[in-house]
Amino acid sequence: MEKAIRNFLSQESAGGILLLVAVALAMLMANSPLAGLYQGFLGTEVQVRVGALDLHKPLLLWINDGLMALFFLLIGLEVKRELLEGALSSVAQASLPTFAAIGGMLVPAGIYLLFNYGDPVTQAGWAIPAATDIAFALGIMALLGSRVPVALKVFLLALAIIDDLGVIVIIALFYSTDLSTISLIIASIAIVGLVALNRKGVTALAPYGVLGLVLWVAVLKSGVHATLAGVIIAFCIPLRAKDGSSPSEHLEHSLHPWSTFLILPVFAFANAGVALGNMSLNTLISPVPVGIALGLMLGKPIGVMLFSYAAVKLRLAQLPNGIGWKQIAPVAAMCGIGFTMSMFIASLAFEQADPMYGDLARLGTLIGSILAALIGYFWLSKVLPKQGV
């Protein structure tokens, strides 16, 4: 039994399976007699007081602001590694996934705005279908095992990382609220300290952790979303020490299982519970869920393929060795798996609006992501060579 559990946890697909279980459990509880317990649990006030510092938020916001900051720390570490040493470290390697990611963000956002034209409240959700859930997309691809060429995995990983970088910029520019000058000054001082540690060649993670915590609290209080603190911390942690070791990769490897098996499933459970009982057919086909679902299911693959094809034809990029358009197309469909990232943006976009909009956004995300996952999986399975061929 223990061996079976260890084998499951070692598989790349395990994270995607756990996310599905978390989503299913959240939907079950939100649409059962346990709905009150589910909502009450997420609404539980949690207070942390240290001297004059007093933080009190519902559990849901601790998950979205705290746990997701750790997830974005991991994303930041991955982005930095790929930019300096990995699949994005040269123009030739980065060109195709960069153009693909840009198209995969612009076209879904355009489709969403097309359906929500003229409504300033719902237009705030334009970035929801622009996101890709890197963990879930790679998990779905991993279900096909060794049939998937390494170059195709690298393409999806690079594309998703650039997509994440785009999401980080979007959050910073478009989803920050009224700013606190004092908190921003404290955050700036913490950033200067983190940069100084990096420049001095400090490789111990503890000093980065202390200043990082100060930065997170300051950013949380500043009006800029707290998850951005995780990215800043990641960019300041050294990739290589003088002895050749990598503090950044060590932390990345330590965070990966926590992210896969705790942070993302907990986030999905906390945010995916949509009560369907009070929704009519007209509500289900309203502009918000339709715009998100079509943005993910159609906009993502169209944008990725259109911009990739144009970049190759204009000789701005080239296809990976041994990979053709028939393999790129189903991967483009998989990019429509928005899940946790899209839900996260939805929580920011409609934070001040009627809760109904958040429910509609999550519903659209679930529908679009599940359809994108199914289409991408079966399409890729069809075009890849059979096992042993």
From Swiss-Prot:
GO biological process, one term: regulation of pH
Topology in the lipid bilayer: Multi-pass membrane protein
Localization terms from the record: Cell inner membrane
GO molecular function, one term: sodium:proton antiporter activity
Role this protein plays: Na(+)/H(+) antiporter that extrudes sodium in exchange for external protons.
GO cellular component assignments: plasma membrane
The protein's name: Na(+)/H(+) antiporter NhaA
Native organism: Shewanella sp. (strain MR-4)
Similarity remark: Belongs to the NhaA Na(+)/H(+) (TC 2.A.33) antiporter family.
Catalysis performed (reactions): Na(+)(in) + 2 H(+)(out) = Na(+)(out) + 2 H(+)(in)
Principal location listed in the UniProt entry: membrane
Superkingdom as given in the UniProt entry: Bacteria
Membrane-crossing residue ranges in chain numbering: 17-37, 59-79, 95-115, 124-144, 154-174, 177-197, 213-233, 261-281, 287-307, 328-348, 363-383
Keywords: Antiport, Cell inner membrane, Cell membrane, Ion transport, Membrane, Sodium, Sodium transport, Transmembrane, Transmembrane helix, Transport
Entries under InterPro entries matching the protein: Na/H_antiporter_dom_sf, NhaA
Gene giving rise to this polypeptide: nhaA
